[in-house]
Regions:
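C-terminal accessory region of radical SAM enzymes
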Residues: 132-160, 186-232
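Canonical radical SAM enzyme core domain
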Residues: 1-46, 53-62, 82-94
Length: 281
């Protein structure tokens, strides 16, 4: 369809990595997939306790092998997603050393840290293991430093962001196996958040009120957001956080911004100063 209509198309996938092989990577590349994100939640003990196979067998070694396959494959970028909470934060330093230049030397991969949150009713019992908003900036700053120590090229830099998430655009959706459509994947399966369905020709039909409610979210209409100095780098925050806290998409959805931006700026400036000093030497 895209070729016939001269539309540029690329995609990426998020996967646990256990089914990746050279044939799968070949097919992904053939269909313009340029990014594969694989989740790794700690060293073997921590990861295998969180992400075992259905039969209980460990998956850590298979995931590492899959990451290596992606790194060896041309035209596909590898992203390692590490989900962080209080139960595995101490394990993460060891993991970064294992992945880095002193271990498996997978430094060509990008690292993405996910802050675990108890964002749904099913996850509410896990809240005690999640970091408070006031703790996130210090946690991330420490992890950024560990990335650089272990040979990963990473310099956090605040960016102007009119939308907190791409799911506020008119071209990104979450589609479940029954062809129901949602905007945020955290809402998949919750009827009140379903925005429509996909018909046999791939069209979005049966749009619900939730679609228009989500798409009309405007942080400038919210007094707290409108007066907030973080708005240009936040875009009003996460709609899922907003709904979970206030039962509406139209409230502030502050997450991973306040306190983090300051750390990003300091980290970025310090790296620039260090680079300039080294160049002058």
């Amino acid at each position: 369809y895209c070729t016939q209509n001269s539309i540029s198309f690329s995609c990426g996938i998020i996967t646990n990595g256990t089914l990746l092989n050279n044939y799968v990577l070949q097919q992904l590349s053939k269909h313009n997939c340029n990014m594969v994100q694989i989740t790794l939640d700690g060293m073997p003990e921590a990861h295998n306790s969180r992400r075992p196979y259905k039969n209980g067998n460990p998956s850590f070694n298979d995931v590492i092998d899959s990451i290596k396959k992606v790194l060896a494959y041309p035209k596909i970028n590898a992203v390692i997603r590490i989900n962080i909470d209080k139960t595995n934060i101490n394990d993460t330093d060891t993991l970064l050393k294992y992945l880095g230049k002193y271990g498996e030397n997978l430094t060509c991969a990008s690292i993405d840290f996910g802050i675990v949150r108890s964002s749904t009713s099913a996850c509410s019992s896990y809240a005690g293991n999640c970091f408070a908003d006031s703790e996130i900036s210090d946690v991330l700053e420490h992890l950024w430093n560990e990335l650089q120590v272990n040979g990963f090229a990473y310099t956090p830099r605040p960016m102007q962001r009119w939308m907190f998430c791409g799911l506020y655009s008119d071209s990104q959706f979450t589609v479940t196996p029954d062809c129901s459509v949602y905007k945020c994947w955290e809402h998949a399966g919750f009827e009140q958040h379903r925005v429509g369905t996909i018909d046999s020709e791939g069209n979005l039909i049966n749009k619900t009120y939730a679609f228009y409610d989500w798409m009309t979210r405007d942080p400038l209409e919210n007094h707290e957001c409108r007066e907030c100095v973080y708005l240009p780098v936040c875009g009003g925050g996460c709609g899922s956080v907003s709904y979970n806290q206030s039962k509406t998409y139209h409230a502030p959805g502050c997450f991973k911004t306040k306190g983090v931006v300051e750390k990003q700026i300091l980290h970025f400036v310090n790296e620039k100063i260090k680079t300039n000093v080294e160049v002058k030497k």
